[in-house]
Amino acid sequence: MRSARIAELLRPFLSGSCHSESGRRPGETCPERSRREPAVLSATQLDRISTYIDLLIRWNSRINLTAIRDREEIITRHFGESLFAARHLFPEEDSPQRHTRVGHDFSRANAGSRQSGALAPEVRIRLADLGSGAGFPGIPIKLWASDIALTLIESNHKKAAFLREVVRSLTLTNVDIQNKRAEAINQTYEVVTLRAVEHFGDALRVAARLTTPSGRLALLIGSSQLDDAQSTLPGVAWQPPVPVPQSQSRILLVGTVVPTM
């Protein structure tokens, strides 16, 4: 598929965070940054998305990665939703690669190391994608914010093999694939994402455990799951849900894990 068509299909998902009125509290105003025109993906990002789609369709004939077969629907349903979450989690300033870790100015701290081509590991944001499956939203988030350290948690061996092939083919660095159940993970992460998992309540509790205190938990879920999420994790400071573009029922729900005393 041509890069121009991919960019066109993804444009609605890369608009400013506040374009949807229903995602804001009464009286809340949009930051000036969020009123800008939709972000523009680079040629490299678009090429990687195209390669990813080809891999997904080829592997999907052998293992069940997605029920969606149409390329354009794959772009809007999988990549669009994932990049929508990416822009909310890591809103761009001068470029998609500049973002701030909790309590730490990432762009300034790494100014010298960026010039040398190395990144200080102590300031790299760690993001875990729980139940990663075909890699959504974790890998598209990595394509958007390449400086993060990404962990893909997937217990299914065949799906984990697919994830390794995607990471290799896209030449992604600082990506760790954990082929095990999330309950067996002892590491914690600044950001944990969750999308389309079984046993939703149990997965939520595991995701919260994997999130560092003051870290963020990001859920791409159906609106019917909103009450379950909020009641299952009442200790999370949830932001108002944000509707996903071009969907009647999908939402992005982001919350901060409140430190316990």
What are these regions (language model features)?
Residues 1-16, 39-93, 128, 158-159, ...:
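Class I SAM-dependent transferase core
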Residues 127-129, 150:
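Short glycine-aspartate micro-motif
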Residues 1-46, 90-126, 258-261:
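Intrinsic disorder/low-complexity segments
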Residues 131-135:
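Class I SAM-dependent methyltransferase "Motif I" SAM/SAH-binding loop
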Residues 36, 136-138, 143-261:
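S-adenosylmethionine
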Residues 26-27, 32-34, 52, 188, ...:
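Generic detector of short, well-ordered, non-transmembrane alpha-helical segments enriched
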